[in-house]
Swiss-Prot record:
Phylogenetic placement of the source organism: Archaea, Thermoproteota, Thermoprotei, Thermoproteales, Thermoproteaceae
Binding sites annotated in the UniProt record for NAD(+): 6-11, 31, 93, 116-118
Annotated organism of origin: Pyrobaculum aerophilum (strain ATCC 51768 / DSM 7523 / JCM 9630 / CIP 104966 / NBRC 100827 / IM2)
Protein name: Malate dehydrogenase
GO BP of this protein: carboxylic acid metabolic process; tricarboxylic acid cycle
Record key words, sorted: NAD, Oxidoreductase, Tricarboxylic acid cycle
Keyword Oxidoreductase among record annotations: yes
GO MF: L-malate dehydrogenase (NAD+) activity
Gene name as annotated: mdh
């Protein structure tokens, strides 16, 4: 059973896409708002019936119902509003994530957790501490979205399909994340050789500011991109795909970093993170990466200790 905690725009988008991909025959929606997950589940069941899908959606306000879940997606948290930085969300969302983490530990101690709550990397750390799970089973969703955005903007410049690009984005999911054009390839040729310096600068800027741009345009943050990315990650777990993708995980010596979650390439399968892939970086790229690590460290250091137990 797949459980999605949080029945807002991202959670419901993920639920719909996962159902269309037939990743499980039961998808549980959890939310603290009475009636919300039940109503969403009923609507999705009608969709499932119309499309002939063998997928049952169930809505609940009780954490005890997550028992038996092998994969839990956490999208709960305060939304990012126009002009708000991810850092401003820290304290309020740390409390929410810590509470959810304790419930997961109680009712689904063998599950794999993927979360989207911002600021993402710091919340991944909070979830890791709150559950007490191995780092392989607590994964921050961000990199699939960031990499997808990089591929989209680069493909527009090149006039090719985004599917032709293997993108790499590293560091913090936020203002200090950095796409790596020298390690992002089109059939073995790096983007840094296919695009001019000015084009690369534009692609990187568009990628970094994409989330804020969506919020600015429509007044609320992205949901379809994250929903699709979550479904891709869920597929890797449920089908043991051993898929290479970008995600935020707690590093344990990789890149010379310990006990800090940041976006890096991983191999994802049924057991969670199978392997963290270490990309060879130039000195300049290494400096940018470490700047991101330091930014995450500062956020983690500002989380109240009571949320890390």
């Amino acid at each position: 059973m797949i459980t999605i905690i949080g029945s807002g725009r991202v959670g419901t988008a993920a639920a719909v896409i996962m159902g269309l991909m037939k990743l499980d025959n039961k998808i549980l929606l959890i939310d603290i708002v009475k009636g919300l997950p039940q109503g969403e589940a009923l609507d999705m069941n009608h969709m499932s019936s119309i499309l002939g899908l063998d997928v049952e959606y169930v809505g609940s306000n009780e954490y005890k119902d997550i028992e038996g879940s092998d994969l839990i997606i956490v999208t709960a948290g305060l939304p990012r509003k126009p002009g708000m930085t991810r850092e401003q969300l820290l304290e309020a969302n740390a409390k929410i994530v810590a509470e959810i983490g304790r419930e997961i530990k109680k009712y689904a101690p063998d599950s794999i957790v993927i979360l989207t709550t911002n600021p993402l990397d710091a919340m991944t750390y909070v979830m890791w501490k709150a559950t007490g799970f191995p780092r392989e089973r607590v994964i921050g969703f961000s990199g699939v979205l960031d990499a997808g955005r990089l591929a989209f903007y680069a493909a527009k410049k090149l006039g090719i399909s985004p599917a032709s690009i293997l993108p790499i984005v590293l560091g913090q999911h936020g203002e200090s994340m950095f796409p790596v054009p020298s390690k992002s390839y089109v059939h073995g040729v790096p983007l840094s050789k296919l695009l001019t310096e000015e084009q690369l600068k534009e692609v990187v800027e568009e990628t970094v500011k994409a989330g804020a741009r969506i919020t600015e345009l429509r007044g609320f943050s992205s949901n379809w991109g994250p929903g699709a990315g979550l479904a891709i990650m869920a597929e890797a777990v449920k089908r043991d795909a051993k898929r290479a993708l970008i995600a935020s995980v707690v590093l344990q010596g990789e890149y010379g970093v310990r006990d800090v979650p940041v976006e890096v390439p991983i191999i994802l399968g049924r057991s969670g993170v199978v392997k963290v892939l270490e990309v060879e970086l130039t000195e300049e790229e290494r400096q940018k990466f470490m700047q991101s690590v330091e930014a995450v460290k500062k956020l983690v250091a500002s989380v109240p200790p009571s949320y890390l137990q």
